[in-house]
Amino acid sequence: MTVSAALQQSADEAGLLPSHQARLDYRTGKGWSTAGVANGFVQGNLAIIPERYAGAFHRFCQLNPKPCPIIGMSDPGNPHIPALGADLDIRTDVPRYRVWRDGEMVEEPTDLLAHWRDDLVTFVLGCSFSFEEALMADGLPIRHIEQGCRVPMYRTNIACTPSGQFAGPMVVSMRPFKPAQAIRAVQITTRFPAVHGAPVHLGLPEQIGIADINTPDYGDPVPVGTDEIPVFWACGVTPQAVIAAAKLPFAITHAPGLMLITDLRNKDLAVL
């Protein structure tokens, strides 16, 4: 039985949404990738920073909506965002987190109970996992889901618009498709601007500063067939790279590929 099928069975038995059941599973230490988990529900990237930096970071997200589309934001010190889900706790409901100090990643805990502070503001940013459901519904193959690994992600030479101390390159995720499939993928994902929208680049990875497509900066490599082209979407790991470059004294993000699963429905994010 697949992880997704087992999750659905557990949710049905408990009378819960699959998204809620997934959060409960992660809360108890089950740390698998969230790709393909709780299909139909919106997944989000996390950026958790001290309140004193939150204004500049919020502005950064507004200036860079492709990689940083905000779908939720907490009050300072509040680990709950009710609009995103019932019984949702930012401190425990993600499979793995990253703790940053002065720009260095110092720990990858499975919960934040020992790290939580009253001044922390959580930003939840849209994730491309959400539009993957629409791609698969149209019959398009998603390579990293087929292979049971994390989506490959790369730093690029595409500069984000800076805000205060927040600046740096865009990070992109990659999915390979045959040319006709790539055209269809553009058409489908254009409908989902709240989760990165249309791709930012197709083919020739060197044009956006990617030297070796087989060596991603985050996630896992996937094969690209000789009859396929790589298609790149803006990625919510961008703020992770930007926060690290800003060398904040303290910050928290999710571990790449291990997202927050919300109770929002993917179909409700479509604009057409």
Curated annotation (Swiss-Prot):
Give the protein family. Answer: Belongs to the D-glutamate cyclase family.
> What are the record keywords, sorted?
Lyase
The domain of life for this entry's organism is Bacteria
User: Might you give the EC number(s) for this enzyme?
Assistant: 4.2.1.-
Q: Which GO terms describe its molecular function?
A: lyase activity
The protein's matches in InterPro entries, at most eight in alphabetical order, are given as: D-Glu_cyclase (IPR009906), Putative_hydro-lyase (IPR038021), UPF0317 (IPR016938)
Q: Matching Gene3D superfamilies, A to Z? A: PSTPO5379-like, PSTPO5379-like domain
Q: Which organism is it from?
A: Bradyrhizobium sp. (strain ORS 278)
The protein's matches in SUPFAM superfamilies, at most eight in alphabetical order, are given as:
PSTPO5379-like (SSF160920)
**HAMAP family assigned to the protein according to its UniProt record, in alphabetical order:** Hydro_lyase
This one is known as Putative hydro-lyase BRADO2538
